């Protein structure tokens, strides 16, 4: 229940592995191969946890018309056409976005992306009501137990990597969760 405060710190640890893989590979491989190896390493380290969740969301939103049907599809362990399509597209977008960044900034961008995204996810859990009403839910206890103190610790680790960029405009990434409610 108290692990939410370390969500962004976990993002820093996982992404540091990916950033180190990118950095080491960049000495012997092209930027493209280095990015792909970094992506593979973070997917492997997390057990494809986030990709599985994203595929479930794509399947649910693509195949369901009501809240109940969407949630039922998302709970189904099978991978559907919308999930596969979503995974291919999101990984292609991630690769393409990293490819557009100066190679020097890619490791910092990887670390920032992982920490900020986990901070945003935790913020949304804190600010929004839980969707599922059933008692057998896995995430509802975590969603109810996040305090402002836990969110503050998470914010510290989530936003820390942004301060290593040379422009204060990078801090604009924290605005979407603020306006999401």
Task: Annotate each language-model stretch with its function.
Residues 49-53:
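Juxtamembrane transmembrane-helix boundary signature
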Residues 59:
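Carboxylate-dense, calcium-coordinating segments in secreted/extracellular and ER-lumen proteins
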Residues 1-47, 63-68, 76-77, 82-181:
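Hydrophobic alpha-helical transmembrane segments
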């Amino acid at each position: 229940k108290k692990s939410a405060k370390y969500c962004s710190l976990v993002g820093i640890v996982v992404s540091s592995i990916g950033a180190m893989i990118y950095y080491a590979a960049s000495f012997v491989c092209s930027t493209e191969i280095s990015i792909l190896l970094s992506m593979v390493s973070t997917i492997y380290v997390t057990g494809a946890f986030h990709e599985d969740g994203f595929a479930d969301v794509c399947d649910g939103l693509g195949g369901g018309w009501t809240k109940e049907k969407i949630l039922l599809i998302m709970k189904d362990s099978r991978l559907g056409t919308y999930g596969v399509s979503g995974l291919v597209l999101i990984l292609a977008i991630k690769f393409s976005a990293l490819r557009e960044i100066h190679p020097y900034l890619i490791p910092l961008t990887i670390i920032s992306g992982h920490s900020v995204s986990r901070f945003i996810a935790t913020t949304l859990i804190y600010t929004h009501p839980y969707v599922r009403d059933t008692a057998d839910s896995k995430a509802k206890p975590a969603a109810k137990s996040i305090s402002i103190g836990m969110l503050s610790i998470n914010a510290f680790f989530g936003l820390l990597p942004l301060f290593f960029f040379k422009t204060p405009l990078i801090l604009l990434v924290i605005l979407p969760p603020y306006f999401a409610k």
